[in-house]
């Protein structure tokens, strides 16, 4: 069993990761992957030559390291009994939120994809597809959506 969970920078993520570890233990999952989706716009560097290519690569590496450290801090602060003996890793992916993690779950043949519930949106924001809409438009695997009552 392979469980993939979104670990995006959100107030809901800590609880989602905690639940992902609990579910992984319940299913005796052999693997848990915490995926940080990084928007391509954060690396918005036009590559015209070797110098700008190097700049874009360094920026991606820095963002990947920052996200990995953030997620590792969340896991370190979980009680040891929740972590159990689950083998987990982090994976940074660049692209459109929702679509990227859905595609990743499909490629790695995840048995379960765990996502945060939607953030509250204004009327204008509802006109544009959000991460869950991308996932639900083409469901790559079983999906569990965690709704955290404290944060929405």
Residue ranges and their predicted role:
Residues 1-2, 104-152:
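Gly/Ser-rich helix-loop-strand patches that form or flank binding pockets
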Residues 2-60, 76, 80-83, 87, ...:
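Small/aliphatic-rich secondary-structure junction motif
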Residues 16-17, 97-98, 128:
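Amphipathic coiled-coil/heptad-repeat helices and related helical stalk/stem segments
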Residues 19, 103-104:
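A short acidic, amphipathic alpha-helical/loop segment
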Residues 64-76:
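Short, surface-exposed alpha-helical segments at coil->helix boundaries
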Residues 92-100:
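Charged docking surfaces used in two-component/phosphorelay signaling
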